[in-house]
Amino acid sequence: LDEDKIKELYIKKCYNRIQVHAESKQIKGKVVVVFNIDEGPKIRIAKINFTGNEHFKRRKLLKQMETRQKHFPTFIFPGRFDQKKFESDIEKVKEFYMNNGWLDVDIGWEIIYREDNKNMNILVHVKEHERYYVESLNIHGASLFTEEELKEKLKLQEGGPFYLDAVDKDTYQIRLMYGEQGYIGAMVKEKHTFTSEGARVNLAFNIDEKDRYYIEKISA
């Protein structure tokens, strides 16, 4: 064991202010490592709050996270704080914002210990910045479908928000439409560029339809 491993074990048991100091001693001619441990109080998450979240309610953001504040029944929701898990949760909240068009979102957080030394609050600071929108949407290389037929099946639309996760989904949707018509080798490449004015995106899908496949024979 080392200091970090010991701290990790205690933190899993809600001793978030654990202090561990290792020192070496000579005992009967042998070097012995002694760990001095100050457990501190057992602390649980009493509340998780957000600031700066103008477009999403607290409850919506909490749903993106695995970390839960303490509430009944406490054996299921003990309010345990795991820093690695919480940092991963912060990334999930950031990804949620980006997938809804806030590509420049900044998120930070801080721990505030309560006076009772048994509970802590976590305050998450959100700076949303501007939301990105689709300035233009163009589809090149399509002959099987009209541009309008393809566009109406896409989540991303001109003038609408630039949903980051919709880029891959819409690329797949176009390939699916071609596959259903026998163009199973069709290739779709997406390209987006940011305009010089404001939070705007020019989006293009380039299609290489390839050959159409036919079923020659079906054997029983």
What positions do the PLM features span?
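Interaction-mediating elements
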Residues: L1-A220
